[in-house]
Amino acid sequence: MNIHSVMPLNAVARKTRASSADAPPGPKRDAILRAAIDTFAERGYFNAQVADVARAAGVAAGTVYLYFKSKDDLLVSIFERSMREGLTDSRAAVADLADPPERLRRLARGHLARLGNDRNLAVVFQVELRQSTKFMERFSSTLLRDYLGLMREAIADGQREGLFRADIKPTSAAKMLFGALDEMATNWILSRRRYSLEAVADEVVDFFLNGARAR
């Protein structure tokens, strides 16, 4: 399953209720979010209850509702916080790089490293998020668009420098590259074999660059 089959860039985010992603951070809120990631990954989002999350976080069930409106709000908050952290890390990773191919390589490595270093987060992102209709109604497409924008900018810069084919649409190419990384992350979760997810990044980028390079 590709993320763009369930999270189109031009999706209109129908936020019927405000997310708690922008609530003041704190150790207890962070602990609840971490517990939610682990609980949703281990039990499955639909099978998990807020009480399960509270138990894993070591707090009363009522305490969860001081920070999050519902189980759905927890799921949206996981996505938004993780995407914001990913954006910050990705921007920092390419801030000192001018070379477009190397920027794509660093972005790919960083994306797979984040998921590869936190298997439960990867399960939530690759599996659980995509099964929630309410999440699909509420998630912010802006974060995903900004995240893919880093790849799109590198591709557009490569075209201006004559490194990449001019007939490629940067937005479409960014989706293709991200889609390949997304699929590798899903395969990593489903595989019985244990291996470094980050190590796959270079293979994906090399394959992409071979098709994108100017002839």
Predicted regions: what they are:
Residues 31, 39-73, 77:
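Helix-turn-helix
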Residues 84-88, 135-161, 171-175, 179, ...:
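Amphipathic alpha-helical packing segments from all-alpha helical-bundle domains
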Residues 113-117, 153, 157, 177-195, ...:
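Amphipathic C-terminal alpha-helical segment
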